[in-house]
Amino acid sequence: MIVTDASFWVSALLTQDVHHGDADALLRRIAVEEIPVIAPTIAIIEVAGALIRRTKDPRAVEKSVRHLQLQPGLTLVPITAPFAEAAAKVAIASSLRGADAIYLTLARQEGLPLITNDNEILQRGAPFASVLTPTEWLRQNPGTEA
């Protein structure tokens, strides 16, 4: 089981993204091996915002967001008031943006690795949870393909 952030999903969904290859490879592994994935509900909003800024294509973005929400094995976790308080503490301690602290807090509370391509999370997240790029996760978890 893993936690994913918006940067992972954007890389997986946009073929022109510099990290698309490994993000797509991980997404295929998730599907084939039925790896459970969790993400906070804010991921939907962040993915939509990032995609529209990069593509300027509202229809394509809406389709991508629907595709994200229908991913098998993906559980979207709502943000409660106690969770928000915990994430605020992580934001303060790490100097991360609020949304980034939400992903990190979810990974910390669940005891799971956070898969991200976000440099700030990669640089500042380690004291709170295991933080890996898709490339690192794939390297640490070789597939069983023949």
Spans of features found by a protein language model:
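Active-site-proximal, substrate-binding regions of enzyme catalytic domains
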Residues: 46-77
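Short beta-strand scaffold positions
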Residues: 4, 38-39, 78, 98, ...
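Short, well-structured N-terminal submotif of metal-dependent ribonuclease cores
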Residues: 1-39, 54-63, 137-145
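Alpha-helix capping/helix-boundary segments
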Residues: 8, 43-44, 83, 102-103, ...
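Acidic, PIN/NYN-like endoribonuclease modules and their adjacent C-terminal/linker elements
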Residues: 1, 76-77, 104, 108-146
